[in-house]
């Protein structure tokens, strides 16, 4: 690889990753709302059209019926959850890299970067699961016509009152199935594209803003190419009525495949891919900007 990195600071990764997560949510939440509504819409009755025919139809109907606020519905949950989640995510990646280095100047291979990314996926599941559970419930309730929860805190409170801590953490296993391999792909792809973009004799840290944006966007696409099938299972499982899937995601899979085919595992694909590039481009740019600021302001942190 072209760059000889500075000693890795997991703490700086933690702080810069939190800022990157905020950037991701602001850019990507509208299409995340569309994705969840497409993934959780019920099968259409014979002879009747589906509630949403696709990504743009869902976007248009949501905007028309609920305004711009409808597209940002449930955003408080990911802002509250995503900021620490991405902080922990980038911390886990930094720690994973540091654990594999014998010396600060060691340059990691791509399989080692993938392994470091997988560690970050394990770290983030504890934060990601309740945030995703609340977000999905808030996103689908408007399209169902039922208003059970008035907001993020109300949803968390009612889930805890009805089902305890297990109700808030419903979907932990399938979230792990999604995030561990997807996070490995995410960070490995970002480092790979950055190295491709780095001219001979230059350092990766000197990449221009457009190249950082493209590298982050491509990393987001590769991440979601791995994550979409378990994400569909997660969305269905987390928004299902209590007791509908007693055996977890396996019951969701048994219902989806016979009824809707293998393609049902890629519901919301267009919305995910349209969102993946700009949202993750913003995330990595935010991370890099914050990291440069921290390196300047606190070089010894």
Curated annotation (Swiss-Prot):
Pfam families with a match to the protein in the record: Mito_carr
GO BP of this protein: carnitine transmembrane transport; lipid transport; mitochondrial transport
GO MF term (any one): O-acyl-L-carnitine transmembrane transporter activity
A GO cellular component entry from the record: mitochondrial inner membrane
Membrane-traversing stretches: 13-31, 74-93, 113-131, 171-190, 212-230, 268-287
Modified residues (N6-succinyllysine): 170
Top-level taxon of origin: Eukaryota
Mitochondrial matrix side: 32-73, 132-170, 231-267
Described purpose of this protein according to its UniProt entry: Mediates the electroneutral exchange of acylcarnitines (O-acyl-(R)-carnitine or L-acylcarnitine) of different acyl chain lengths (ranging from O-acetyl-(R)-carnitine to long-chain O-acyl-(R)-carnitines) with free carnitine ((R)-carnitine or L-carnitine) across the mitochondrial inner membrane, via a ping-pong mechanism. Key player in the mitochondrial oxidation pathway, it translocates the fatty acids in the form of acylcarnitines into the mitochondrial matrix, where the carnitine palmitoyltransferase 2 (CPT-2) activates them to undergo fatty acid beta-oxidation.
Protein name: Mitochondrial carnitine/acylcarnitine carrier protein
Species in which this protein is naturally found: Macaca fascicularis (Crab-eating macaque)
